[in-house]
Amino acid sequence: GTFYLYFKDKYELQDVLLAKTSHEFFANACKKANQHHFDRLDDKIVFIIDSIINELIDRPNILKFIQKNLSLGLYSEKLTDLLDSEELGIKELFIREVKEKDIPLEYPEMTLFMIIELVSSTVFTSIVEKQPLPIDEFKPHLYKTIRLLINEKEL
C-alpha cells in the first residue's frame, strides 16, 4: 500500500537505507576527526577510515547489510535529496583540505572515491572472511595505500 508512495520497489528502499547508514558512518567519523588536530590530510583520512572500520567491526549486522556499498552514502543522489546536512561531509572536507594544504592532486574527488571504494571492497572480506588477512593485519597495508593515493605527487 503506502510503501509505494515513497519507494518504487524494495530495492530502492534498500538503496536509500544503505546510503543513509553509510552517510551516518562518515558523519560520525568526521565529527570524531574534527575533535583532533591533524597536520596532514592523509593522517586525517586514515583516522576517519579507521573509525569507520572499527564501527563496522563492532556492528557485524550493519557490516553485512552495507557489504561493499560504503560509497553509497557519499555518491547517492537520492540521499542528497533526503538529507539536509549543514555539516561538512568527508567529500567536502577532503576537497577543502586539498586546496587549503595545497596538495597537488589533479582530481581530488576521484581520489577520494577510489579510497572509499578500496576500503569498501577490501574491508568487508577482511573482516568477514579474514582474507587476504584478518583486519588488524590488513589495516597497515590499507592505510599505506591510502597515504600513497593522497600523496601521489610525493612519489
Identify the function of each model-found stretch.
Residues V16, K20, C30-D58, I115:
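Hydrophobic alpha-helical connector segments
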Residues D15, A19, F38, D42, ...:
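Short, structured helix-loop boundary elements
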Residues G1-E12, V16:
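Helix-turn-helix
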Residues V98-T145:
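Hydrophobic/aromatic-rich alpha-helical bundle segments in the mid-to-C-terminal region
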Residues C30-N34, I66-Y75:
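Short linear capping/connector segments at secondary-structure termini
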Residues H23, A27-C30, D43, E55, ...:
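Amphipathic alpha-helical packing segments from all-alpha helical-bundle domains
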Residues K10, L17, T21-F25, I48, ...:
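Hydrophobic/aromatic residues within well-ordered alpha-helical segments
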Residues I150-L155:
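Generic C-terminal helix-cap and adjacent flexible tail
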